Design a protein with these regions (language model features):
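Secretory targeting and sorting signals
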Residues: 2-26
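N-terminal cap/lid segment of alpha/beta-hydrolase-fold proteins
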Residues: 39-81, 444-446
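Cap/lid segment of the alpha/beta-hydrolase catalytic domain
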Residues: 76-156, 477, 555
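Accessory cap/linker subdomain of secreted extracellular hydrolases
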Residues: 104-108, 116, 179-288
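Alpha/beta-hydrolase fold nucleophile elbow
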Residues: 159-171
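Glycine-rich nucleophile elbow surrounding the catalytic serine of serine-hydrolase chemistry
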Residues: 169-179
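Short beta-strand/loop motif that positions the catalytic acidic residue
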Residues: 289, 294-297
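C-terminal, loop-rich substrate-recognition/catalytic regions characterized by aromatic stacking residues
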Residues: 329-588
Length: 588
C-alpha cells in the first residue's frame, strides 16, 4: 500500500516559485492531517472572499460562449497566483433548475463554493443555451463536445490557472462533463459526474419506451431575455442576439420522437443521433483519456443503471450510489466529497481517496428521503455479492413463488393517474391498484436483502401486435401500503436479444432494438420476453411481503402505443415455462 504523505502546515498559505510562476500551495486544516475517510474530509477554507466576473470566450469556430468565473479573493481583489480550475458546462451561467443539479444543500449547485478552497470555478453556458451564442444542433452532440475541449484548454492556459483542470456536472451537465472526457483534452485531469447516460437510447428510451421526464431544453426568445446578461450588456443587446440564434436550434422533442429505434437516422441533425450522443460510442476514447472519474447516482434516479454500466466499462472509476432521487444528496455533504476527489487529482494532496473502495452504495429499507445516518456499504465490483439470482415464479394463482398454472389477465388503461408521483426530474413510478397483474409473496420471516440487477422473464399473451410491458418490484408493508422499489420495461416487439457492445452486469440481457430487429406479436399467441429491472439495494423487513406487478402502461409514458388503451394482456404461468422474476437476494 502506498504510504501516505502527511501535511503539517496548519494555518499557513505558502507561495512557491516554480519556473518563475507564482503557485499557490493550499493551506492545510487545523488538524494538519489531510487523508480522510468517506464523508469526513473537511479542510479549513483558505479564503473567505471571491471575485465574480462574466464575459464571452470564442470557440474554435468563432461561436462565443458565456462564462461566469469565480476566483479566490482577499480584501475584494482576486488573489495573484495560479490555481487549479473546475468547471461546469451548463444551460445558463447562473444557477438554473434546467441544469438538473438540484437545490440541495452542499450539493452540485454549491460546488462554486470551492473557490474558498483555492480553486477557480467556471460556469459555461453551452452553445445555443443561456447567454451563449450559437445553435444547439442536438443534445450532447460532437460540436458541443468540441466546445468542451476548447473551454478546457482555454481555462488551462489563463494567467490564474496552474493547468490542472477538472469538470463536473449532474443530469444533462453530467453528460456534458463526460463528453468533455471523451474529447481527451490534454489538461483535463478529473471528472466528477452524476446521473448521466452511458447510452442515450437505454437512458431516454429504455426498453424502446419513452417514459421519462424530459426531452431537453426548449426555450422562447422571451425566456432567454429574462436571464441575467454578461457584464457590459446592460441593455441585453448581445443577449437578444444570442436568444434569436437559439431559435434555430433543433426541436429536441421532435428529434427524439422521430427515432423510435436505436439505429434511426435523424434528418434534423443529419446523423444516427442515439449513437452520436451516447458516451458508449466513445468508450475507447474515454478509457484512453485516463481521466479519473467519480460517478454519482441514486437508487431513486432513472439513470442509476447508467452509472453502474459506466463504472464497469471504465477501469479505475469511483462509483457512489446513495438513497436519492435525481441529482439529490440529502445526508451527504457532496461538495466535501467532490473536493476530496479534486484535491487529490488536481492538487496532489493525499486525501485518502486513492485507497478508497471503488464502489460505495447505500442500502435502504424505505423509499422515503433519508433523515438519519445512511447505511453505506463498499464493494470491489458490481454486483457486490456472488449470490447470483433467485427465481420467483409468478404463479397463476397470483402468488409470488408459486408454480400454480394459469393466466393473470388485465386490461391496459392509459388514463390512470399516479398520485404524489412528483414532477420533472424526480418523478417516481407508483402502484395503481387494479392497473395490472400483481403477484404477492408470503410475509417474510426475516429481513431479506436484495442487491443487484433483477431480471424479468415473462410470457405474455396480447390481443394486439405490440405492447409496452412494465414490471415493478414492490414492498407491501404489514398495513397494506405498497411501495414501488424499482421497475423495468420493454416494448414486446423489441424482445430480441443480442450480445451487448459493452460490458453489462452479469445476466443482464441486451436488446439491440434496431429497426430490423422489430418482431410484431401474433395476437393471442404466447410470447416470452426478458428484460432487466433497474438495479436496487433494498432490505425487505421481516413481516413485509415482496410483490411483483406487471402492467401495460406507466403514467410517465410520453409516447404510448396508439392502440394500447383497452388492450388485453395475459401473464402466462406454466410449470414447463413459468413467468418469473430473478432477484439478486443476498445470502446471509
Amino acid at each position: 500500500m502506498m504510504s501516505r504523505i502527511r501535511w503539517f502546515l496548519a494555518g499557513l498559505i505558502a507561495v512557491a516559485v516554480v519556473a518563475g510562476l507564482a503557485v499557490v500551495v493550499p493551506r492545510i486544516g487545523e488538524s494538519g492531517e489531510i487523508a480522510a475517510d468517506f464523508a469526513e474530509y473537511a479542510p479549513t477554507p483558505q479564503f473567505t472572499e471571491r471575485t465574480t466576473e462574466t464575459f464571452y470566450v470564442p470557440m474554435s469556430d468563432g461561436t462565443k460562449l458565456a462564462v461566469l468565473l469565480h476566483r479566490p479573493a482577499e480584501n475584494g481583489q482576486a488573489v495573484d497566483g495560479r490555481f487549479p480550475v473546475i468547471w461546469h458546462h451548463k444551460l445558463d451561467i447562473y444557477p438554473s433548475p434546467k441544469d438538473g443539479v438540484g437545490p440541495k444543500e452542499a450539493g452540485y449547485s454549491n460546488l462554486t463554493s470551492m473557490s474558498d478552497q483555492g480553486y477557480v470555478v467556471a460556469q459555461v453556458a453551452r452553445r445555443g443555451n443561456g447567454q451563449s451564442f450559437g445553435v444547439r444542433r442536438g443534445y450532447h452532440d460532437r460540436v458541443e463536445a468540441q466546445d468542451a475541449y476548447d473551454v478546457t484548454e482555454w481555462l488551462a492556459t489563463q494567467p490564474w490557472s496552474n493547468g490542472q483542470v477538472g469538470v463536473y456536472g449532474c443530469s444533462n451537465t453530467g453528460d456534458a462533463a463526460m463528453h468533455a472526457v471523451s474529447m481527451r483534452p490534454p489538461h483535463l485531469k478529473a471528472a466528477f459526474a452524476g446521473c448521466f447516460s452511458w447510452n442515450k437510447y437505454d437512458a431516454m428510451r429504455r426498453g424502446g419506451i419513452a417514459a421519462q421526464w424530459g426531452y431537453g431544453p426548449t426555450r422562447k426568445v422571451e425566456d432567454d431575455l429574462a436571464l441575467t446578461p454578461v457584464s457590459g450588456d446592460d441593455d441585453k443587446t448581445l443577449l437578444r442576439q444570442a436568444a434569436e440564434q437559439h431559435q434555430l436550434s433543433t426541436p429536441l422533442a421532435q428529434m427524439w420522437a422521430g427515432m423510435p429505434y436505436r439505429d434511426d437516422y435523424s434528418t434534423l441533425v443529419g446523423s444516427r443521433f442515439w449513437a452520436e450522443g451516447s458516451l458508449s460510442t466513445y468508450a475507447d476514447q474515454i478509457r484512453e483519456s485516463q481521466v479519473p472519474l467519480y460517478i454519482v447516482g441514486g437508487w431513486r434516479d432513472e439513470f442509476r443503471d447508467q452509472g453502474i454500466v459506466t463504472a464497469l466499462n471504465t477501469s479505475g472509476s469511483k462509483l457512489l450510489i446513495g438513497p436519492w432521487r435525481h441529482c439529490e444528496n440529502p445526508g451527504l455533504a457532496l461538495v466535501q466529497e467532490a473536493q476530496r476527489f479534486f484535491d487529490f487529482h488536481l492538487k496532489g494532496i493525499d486525501t485518502g481517496i486513492d485507497e478508497a473502495p471503488p464502489i460505495r452504495y447505500a442500502i435502504v429499507d424505505s423509499i422515503d428521503d433519508p433523515t438519519g445516518d445512511i447505511d453505506w456499504r463498499t464493494a470491489e465490483s458490481w454486483p457486490p455479492t456472488s449470490s447470483g439470482l433467485t427465481d420467483f415464479a409468478l404463479g397463476g394463482d397470483g402468488v409470488l413463488g408459486s408454480t400454480a398454472p394459469g393466466t393473470s389477465r388485465f386490461t391496459v388503461d392509459t388514463v390512470v393517474e399516479c398520485p404524489d408521483a412528483g414532477e420533472g426530474s424526480t418523478v417516481q413510478p407508483c402502484h395503481v391498484p387494479g392497473a395490472g397483474a400483481s403477484f404477492v409473496g408470503a410475509a417474510l420471516e426475516k429481513d431479506t436483502e436484495v442487491t443487484g440487477t433483477p431480471i424479468a422473464d415473462v410470457t405474455v399473451r396480447v390481443d394486439r401486435d405490440d405492447a409496452h410491458i412494465f414490471a415493478y418490484i414492490e414492498d407491501v408493508a404489514p398495513d397494506g401500503t405498497v411501495s414501488v422499489i424499482t421497475e423495468g420495461r420493454l416494448t414486446a416487439s423489441l424482445r430480441g436479444e443480442t450480445e451487448a457492445p459493452y460490458e453489462l452486469p452479469a445476466e443482464v440481457p441486451f436488446h439491440r432494438s434496431y429497426r430490423e430487429d422489430a418482431q410484431s406479436l401474433t395476437p393471442g399467441e404466447a410470447t416470452r420476453m426478458r428484460f432487466d429491472i433497474l438495479p436496487m439495494s433494498y432490505v425487505f423487513r421481516a413481516g413485509h411481503r415482496m410483490q411483483v406487478t406487471v402492467t401495460g402502461y406507466d403514467q410517465r409514458e410520453t409516447i404510448p402505443l396508439p392502440d394500447a388503451q383497452g388492450s388485453s394482456v395475459e401473464i402466462v404461468s406454466d410449470p414447463s415455462a413459468p413467468s418469473l422474476v430473478q432477484l439478486p437476494v443476498a445470502q446471509s
